[in-house]
Swiss-Prot record:
PANTHER family: CALSYNTENIN (PTHR14139), CALSYNTENIN-2 (PTHR14139:SF3). Changing residue 193 to I: In a colorectal cancer sample; somatic mutation. This is Calsyntenin-2. Binds synaptic Ca(2+) with its cytoplasmic domain. The gene is CLSTN2. It is found in: Postsynaptic cell membrane; Endoplasmic reticulum membrane; Golgi apparatus membrane; Cell projection, Dendrite. The lineage of its organism: Eukaryota, Metazoa, Chordata, Craniata, Vertebrata. PROSITE patterns: CADHERIN_2. Belongs to the calsyntenin family. SUPFAM superfamilies: Cadherin-like, Concanavalin A-like lectins/glucanases.
Length: 955
């Protein structure tokens, strides 16, 4: 029956709507009718739970959004027209998918961001369509609660709170946690917003990290091994998304506070010529808050392996003795092997330092006459010695110097030897000198004798007192034994070095008591003792420790140097003052060419504390000074290397000066970069001049020794004395020695003369000079000189040619008045020969004059005949023409002929006459006459333009 009744509803509604009268009554009728039709409200669930994925618009509801209406299937009244959401600015909307079924959908108006809001709660209601299409009286359902959760998407990577982390750890400790790093994630869900893991990206580091970001060390850290570690750490969220950027963790290793010196460098480079250079400009002492009351610092420069104990001048012993002002008469018992000093030829030698090494199997005999038999009651023995513990039998004597019987007997007259690390000097007087029990053996017991280091020994004898100086310090003998004098005999004595000669009491004379060690500069000076000043100079080191600005050391600082300045002791009670004092300690090497290499450096410290049972210990500073290689000088000798002199000049009292213009120049190569920075050309070397000393120059005779019966080299002793140089002269040449400047040696060489009072059989003599610095360490080039002797029949020709020889441009012409006068004097001939020459010359003058007259007439005719032809030709303008004539070639041309030769002969005759009569014409006029006579006519005019201007040329 209900469906039958419902079919009338539209009709009734139409009738009701269609009636136009009634006004309010009609409206009320419609409501009554609608109430009869739309009896029920829509129905929905009381609550909904929805999920929406962020960045999406679909909401999945549980249960689904469906509204029911009991008025169904009545049109409009039983249909669902809308779902309404109650709330402010909610990003959701509900739409009806099917009015009849009441199915709806909840969706987002715009993308949902979980990071802004994770969940939403709001009210929703369903509305039916009312009673008709134009009805607004819709019925609504009850309010249902909708709760929506936003589902997160892992769109953000973890980020660390700090871009970098820094921590400081103490070496030698294991930490549970050095520091903690922390990362965050901006995702909203626990799954994606939480950090699940941390990881160290840097490999091979002694660190680990846990899931909470705590970093710990896996092993004990050492400050000496590595001062600082830098590691990279990353983080992962629970979705395993890594951090966008790793963070840097810097771990500084702090050393355990150890007392010691800080801020010093192990290698210190020293450039030669740098003067006094600070060794530790920034050093300071760390005491770790120790209660220090006083401090003693010992700085030691170890140079035992440089030369003979330190960097000393390497000049020869003679040069050093001269340089230090030692008395003359010193005899070198270990000279460099040479023809004159051949007794050291068989010894082992280090040529660079002239150090002789004795291996216990060799000795050297000093020839008779080198050392006088009677040394007198005053004499001095000096030597450098390096000696270690005696090998083999300890009782064996090791002889340094020995004077014993050559044959028959085995008496030792005087000797110097080492026995059981004791230095012993034996001196036995003869009966003719003393006849009483006198001191004979002097013993010194010193640790340095067997320490395998170089030491300088001086034994001063003023009998019966004998004093030993070692490294400048004085030592008296700890034991002196007496003995009777030696009985007189006629047995010759043998002086030996490195062993003692055993001439008697054996089947065959031989060496005995061999020395094991090294010796250098072994000398003896009979008749005089050396002063303390000379001894100090001879053993002085040229390198050592120094203090810059002594006045600024500060109060309370005491310091002390040893004699060689290799050890410096400083004491003080204020650490700040001690620091400043040690910062001023420097190294100095005064040699221009020091020995390159390493010098060990040690700084030891002794600390006293305030009443503490245990005081801090400060480790030694172990460093070294590297002395760099000095610039190598190049010594060059230059000057005139060939000249002629007349024989008469060689016979004169002054002789011939050999090296009037010699120059000694020392240069070094300096590398310069090209001026253009962009160029790729190699660097060029530029020679720069430098000044330094020389220690000898040898003038050697080449081609046979000098014959002392007719020739010699001479040099005034005053020239040497005023320049503090010495010289030795022999038939092989002249040797100048002594430490002096290059200019001093130049001045001395300028005065070397050669004389030959029988030059008739000699054509030329050749000489060679070679100079040295530092005992041959640097040598010059070999400068060769040839001196030719002009005999009387060669003087005229040689004079004419000699003045045309042009010296090299870097040489200065040196004119010697004595040379010119000698040449003129040599031209004088005996009176009878002069008369004959005058007569001959007169005849030649007449013949030459006639010949010249005829030649001039012939030339004049020739000029007149050819003048017309020349006018038609192009004139040759030779006003600016310069013709250079080789002065070593012949001057005769095709147009000169015999007339010119005759003119020259006439000229020479006139010169001889002028010389014999004492005429003193100038050199310039003579040269012009010699070049210009005999040229006439056109050739004469042309010769005026081609004249050789030799007014400035030396003879």
């Amino acid at each position: 029956m209900l469906p039958g009744r419902l079919c009338w509803v539209p009709l009734l509604l139409a009738l009701g709507v269609g009636s136009g009268s009634g006004g309010g009554g009609d409206s009320r009728q419609r409501r009554l009718l609608a109430a009869k039709v739309n009896k029920h409200k829509p129905w929905i669930e009381t609550s909904y739970h929805g999920v929406i994925t962020e960045n999406n618009d679909t909401v999945i509801l549980d249960p689904p959004l469906v509204a029911l209406d009991k008025d169904a299937p009545v049109p409009f009244a039983g249909e669902i027209c809308a779902f309404k959401i109650h709330g402010q600015e909610l990003p959701f909307e509900a739409v009806v998918l099917n009015k009849t079924s009441g199915e709806g959908r909840l969706r987002a108006k715009s993308p949902i961001d979980c990071e802004l809001q994770k969940e939403y709660t709001f009210i929703i209601q369903a509305y039916d369509c009312g009673a008709g299409p134009h009805e607004t009286a819709w019925k609504k359902s009850h309010k249902a609660v909708v709760h929506i959760q936003v589902k997160d998407v892992n769109e953000f990577a973890p980020t660390f709170k700090e871009p970098a982390y820094k921590a400081v750890v103490t070496e030698g400790k294991i930490y549970d946690s050095i520091l903690q790093v922390e990362a965050i994630d901006e995702d909203c869900s626990p799954q994606y917003s939480q950090i699940c893991n941390y990881e160290i990206v840097t490999t091979d580091v002694p660190f680990a990290i846990d899931r909470n970001g705590n970093i710990r060390n896996t092993e004990k850290l050492s400050y000496d091994k590595q001062h600082q570690y830098e590691i990279l750490v990353t983080a992962y969220d629970c979705g395993q998304k890594p951090a966008a950027q790793d963070t840097l963790v810097q771990v500084d290793v702090k050393p355990v506070c150890k007392p010691g010196w800080q801020d010093w460098t192990k290698r210190i480079e020293y450039q030669p010529g740098s003067g006094s250079m600070p060794l530790f400009p920034s050093i300071h002492l760390e005491t770790c808050d120790g209660a220090v009351s006083s401090l003693q610092i010992v700085t030691e420069l170890q140079t035992n392996y440089i030369g003979k104990g330190c960097d000393r001048e390497t000049y020869s012993e003679k040069s050093l003795q001269k340089l230090c002002g030692a008395s003359s008469g010193i005899i070198d018992l270990l000279p460099s092997p040479s023809a004159a000093t051949n007794w050291t030829a068989g010894l082992l030698v280090d040529s660079s330092e002239m150090i002789f090494k004795f291996d216990g199997r060799q000795g050297a005999k000093v020839p008779d006459g080198i050392v006088p038999k009677n040394l007198t009651d005053q004499f001095t023995i000096t030597m450098w010695m390096k000696h270690g513990p005696s090998p083999g039998v300890r009782a064996e004597k090791e002889t340094i110097l020995c004077n014993s019987d050559k044959t028959e007997m085995n008496r030792h007259h005087y000797a110097l030897y080492v026995h059981n690390c004791r230095l012993v000097f034996l001196l036995r007087k003869d009966f003719d000198q003393a006849d009483t029990f006198r001191p004979a053996e002097f013993h010194w017991k010193l640790d340095q004798i067997c320490d395998k280091e170089w030491h300088y020994y001086v034994i001063n004898v003023e009998f019966p007192v004998v004093t030993l100086y070692m490294d400048g310090a004085t030592y008296e003998p700890y034991l002196v034994t007496n003995d009777w004098p030696i009985h007189p005999s006629h047995i010759a004595m043998q002086l030996t070095v490195g062993a003692c000669w055993q001439g008697g009491e054996v089947t065959k004379p031989q060496f005995a008591q061999f020395f094991h060690g090294s010796l250098a500069s072994l000398t003896i000076r009979p008749g005089k003792m050396e002063s303390q000043k000379v001894i100090s100079c001879l053993q002085a080191c040229k390198e050592g420790l120094d203090i810059n600005s002594l006045e600024s050391l500060g109060q309370g600082i005491k310091y002390h140097f040893n004699p060689s300045q290799s050890i410096l002791v400083m004491e003080g009670d204020d650490i700040g003052n001690i620091n400043r004092a040690l910062q001023k300690v420097s190294y100095i090497n005064s040699r221009q060419f020091p020995t390159a290499g390493v010098r060990r450096l040690k700084v030891s410290s002794k600390v006293q504390c305030f009443g503490e049972d245990v005081c801090i210990s400060i480790p030694e500073v172990d460093a070294y000074v590297m002395v760099l290689q000095a610039i190598e000088p190049r010594i060059t000798l230059r000057g005139t290397d060939h000249f002629w002199r007349p024989a008469a000049q060689f016979e004169s009292a002054r002789g011939v000066t050999l090296f009037p213009d010699i120059k000694i120049v020392s240069t070094f190569a300096k590398t310069e970069a090209p001026g253009d920075v962009k160029t790729t050309d190699p660097k060029s070397e530029v020679l720069e001049e430098m000044l330094h000393n020389l220690d000898f120059c040898d003038i050697l005779v080449i081609g046979g020794d000098l014959d002392p019966r007719q020739e010699c080299l001479e040099l005034n002793h005053s020239e040497l004395h005023q320049r503090h140089l010495d010289a030795t002269n022999s038939t092989a040449g002249y040797s100048i020695y002594g430490v002096g400047s290059m200019s001093r040696y130049e001045q001395v060489l300028h005065h070397i003369r050669y004389r030959n009072w029988r030059p008739a059989s000699l054509e030329a003599r050749r000489f060679r000079i070679k100079c040295s610095e530092l005992n041959g360490r640097y040598t010059s080039n070999e400068f060769n000189l040839e001196v030719s002797i002009l005999h009387e029949d060669q003087v005229s020709d040689k004079e004419h040619v000699n003045h045309l020889i042009v010296q090299p441009p870097f040489l200065q012409s040196v004119h010697h008045p004595e040379s010119r006068s000698s040449i003129q004097h040599s031209s004088v001939v005996p009176s009878i020969a002069t008369v004959v020459i005058i007569i001959s010359v007169c005849m030649l003058v007449f013949v030459v004059a006639m010949g010249v007259y005829r030649v001039r007439i012939a030339h004049q005719h020739f000029i007149q005949e050819t003048e017309a032809a020349k006018e038609s030709e192009m004139d040759w303008d030779d006003s600016a023409l310069t013709i250079t004539v080789n002065p070593m070639e012949k001057h005769e041309g095709p147009g000169h002929g015999e007339d010119e030769t005759e003119g020259e002969e006439e000229e020479e005759a006139e010169e001889e006459m002028s010389s014999s009569s004492g005429s003193d014409d100038s050199e310039e006029e003579e040269e012009e006459e010699g070049m210009g006579r005999g040229r006439h006519g056109q050739n004469g005019a042309r010769q005026a333009q081609l004249e050789w201007d030799d007014s400035t040329l030396p003879y």
